[in-house]
Amino acid sequence: MPETEEISKGLEDVNIKWTRLTTIDGNKGILRYGGYSVEDIIASGAQDEEIQYLFLYGNLPTEQELRKYKETVQKGYKIPDFVINAIRQLPRESDAVAMQMAAVAAMAASETKFKWNKDTDRDVAAEMIGRMSAITVNVYRHIMNMPAELPKPSDSYAESFLNAAFGRKATKEEIDAMNTALILYTDHEVPASTTAGLVAVSTLSDMYSGITAALAALKGPLHGGAAEAAIAQFDEIKDPAMVEKWFNDNIINGKKRLMGFGHRVYKTYDPRAKIFKGIAEKLSSKKPEVHKVYEIATKLEDFGIKAFGSKGIYPNTDYFSGIVYMSIGFPLRNNIYTALFALSRVTGWQAHFIEYVEEQQRLIRPRAVYVGPAERKYVPIAERK
């Protein structure tokens, strides 16, 4: 059958919902959360919890509202033993995001009475943000062969997470960098993971199942896995002096993909990448081995922009974020960087789920254009040739 009808491959430029959460101008490189530019948010020294609140409630919190909100998030730090067991029964070599999926799926299995409710949805989401911190801490500690640990309340979400993950008091520089990373990865409209989660909750499945679906999509190398792929690329080059040769051999002549470059929406420099680059430069300057990776990245960036900038292909947020995670102290293994992405994005996922279910609820059920054989007659197996 000929392909006579148009389809939207990859759902590109298909609008599936209205949103007050995030707006992107891909041509100008602008990203705003609820009307606030990410540059202003970061420059103002905002805490991640303020941005979490913005996504769930639509406004920045007062001091009193923020204190109350933090208490709700911190309730989620105490995850049940069966969730920790779901993580620790897996091989330590397992993918970190798959471990998160197992833990969140365990939450979904236990929440048999979940009902979408405007009066409680945001409290459920806030507590789940806390649970995601505890889950990610224990995923990391299991991979690193460390005993189970739960985050404890502190001055910030970022600090509680790092203290529990590393088993020591995080430095101010580490906390500030993690806080910024959490904010920058909070949301990005409806990429593959958010869309996957929306499909799940459009059936009125529970919040946790929506997160599990989103994690499954995020796990792929074309979405959340790009940060680790970019670092692996820098490691392959090994030395700044080898960048030009590697670029010509692998990208220009080898036709390989330059990881961390290009974005479906942005046709200019990703504003998040600019911020991550600045943090990577600052943090790596105190760690020679990491700074060498940063030097490789910046030199490769120059070649990439010269070759592809005229086509609207520039560094995206994943190009430098891995260097930031590495500088904080997270190793390149088990897809850990993508799990850190998920720790940030759980806020945006849930905000989109709530917005959709409360205001625009409709089962997402697209169609496919059939291009297979026309009508055929069934032939019994003994008569087939």
Swiss-Prot record:
GO terms for molecular function: citrate (Si)-synthase activity. GO terms for biological process: carbohydrate metabolic process; tricarboxylic acid cycle. The keyword Transferase applies. Pathway: Carbohydrate metabolism; tricarboxylic acid cycle; isocitrate from oxaloacetate: step 1/2. The active site is at residues 223, 263, 318. One of its GO terms (cellular component) is cytoplasm. Belongs to the citrate synthase family. Citrate synthase is found in nearly all cells capable of oxidative metabolism. Homodimer. This is Citrate synthase. It comes from Thermoplasma acidophilum (strain ATCC 25905 / DSM 1728 / JCM 9062 / NBRC 15155 / AMRC-C165). The gene is gltA.
